[in-house]
Curated annotation (Swiss-Prot):
Keyword match Lyase: yes
Protein's UniProt name: Enoyl-CoA hydratase ChsH3
Stated family: Belongs to the enoyl-CoA hydratase/isomerase family.
EC category: lyase
Record-annotated active site: D189, H194
Subunit structure: Homodimer.
PANTHER family named among the record's database cross-references: ENOYL-COA HYDRATASE CHSH3 (PTHR13078:SF59), PEROXISOMAL MULTIFUNCTIONAL ENZYME TYPE 2-RELATED (PTHR13078)
Catalytic activity field: (22E)-3-oxochola-4,22-dien-24-oyl-CoA + H2O = (22S)-hydroxy-3-oxo-chol-4-ene-24-oyl-CoA
Origin species: Mycobacterium tuberculosis (strain ATCC 25618 / H37Rv)
Key words of the record: Cholesterol metabolism, Lipid degradation, Lipid metabolism, Lyase, Steroid metabolism, Sterol metabolism
């Protein structure tokens, strides 16, 4: 069904109420590779029983963490087949460290919808607040919908992420476990693209790929561990664009540049001619 811009743009979804526990946080951070050295206190700080420190990227998944069915893309004025949708970008901003357990209310609205001709880019913003109205985090997301352009909307900006023209200040090896996608799917993303070899083959991939949000969260953790002394509370904002795929079992490289107070990065796959997996990575310290 074509996108109905008059209905979709500015539409606000019904509020979603949800809660999470320290066990959810532990599982999420295990899914990102926390605990790779079970004797390292810094790794164990992500997995403490009642008070794990919480990476801000947990805010990107908290509202859907307990879903056990594949997601749908059906919203006011928007009805798109999941197989046509690619995750384009993600960002989270936190005014204060996230608690290891709690309850929240999330409200999502569609902020921009761009007509790229053969595709559409749909941008949304979600605010999560405590039951008494305190802002916990703001999440911004864009998706790329193949075959959904041509509805008469504005083309919008062209995203371009150019890494600094100098050698990175730091390079971090980021190994992906062979079973990492199977573990991360327990964090609320049951898209079979990440677990079913036949589904992945039908989508054009040689094997299931890693969730983009897993690579996204792993990269945040890698930068926090390398440059912020493994202190998840030192992050005020973090975001990235999804430029390519990652496969379980490979090792990625995180290239990090210091840019004033910001840390900017890209993620590449060295065994695939440095194919770019994430671009425009930005971490803003608190």
């Amino acid at each position: 069904m074509p996108i109905d811009l008059d209905v979709a743009l500015g539409a606000q979804l019904p509020p979603v109420e949800f809660s999470w526990t320290s066990t959810d946080v532990q599982l999420y951070q295990l899914g990102l590779g926390a605990g790779s050295d079970p004797m390292n206190p810094r790794e164990l700080s992500y997995l403490a029983d009642d008070t794990p420190q919480v990476l801000p990227t947990f805010g990107n998944v908290a509202a859907t963490f307990h879903l056990t069915t594949p997601p749908t893309v059906q919203f006011p004025g928007i009805d798109i087949e999941l197989s046509k949708v690619l995750h384009a970008s993600e960002r989270v901003e936190v005014p204060a460290p996230l608690p290891p357990s709690g309850s929240a209310r999330a409200v999502t609205r569609f902020t921009d919808i761009w007509d790229k001709g053969k595709a559409a880019v749909i941008c949304s913003e979600t605010t999560a607040t405590t039951p008494d109205g305190l802002l916990l985090w703001t999440q911004k997301r864009s998706i790329y919908a193949r075959g959904e352009g041509g509805f008469g909307g504005k083309r919008g900006p062209s995203g371009s992420d150019v890494a600094p023209e100098r050698a990175p200040d730091l390079q971090v090896a980021m190994p992906i476990l062979p079973q990492q996608a199977l573990l991360y799917r327990l964090c609320g993303d049951r898209n079979p693209l990440h677990s079913d070899p036949e589904f992945a083959a039908a989508a054009g991939f040689p094997r299931p790929i890693l969730h983009g949000l897993c690579t996204y969260g792993m990269t945040c953790k890698a930068i926090v561990d390398a440059l912020l002394d493994s202190d998840a509370t030192a992050v005020a904002g973090y975001g990235a664009r999804f430029a390519g795929v990652a496969y379980p079992g490979e090792t990625l490289t995180v290239n990090v540049w210091k840019d004033g107070r910001r840390l900017v990065a890209s993620v590449v796959a060295p065994t695939r001619d440095n194919a770019v997996v994430l671009s425009g990575v930005e971490l803003v310290p608190a």
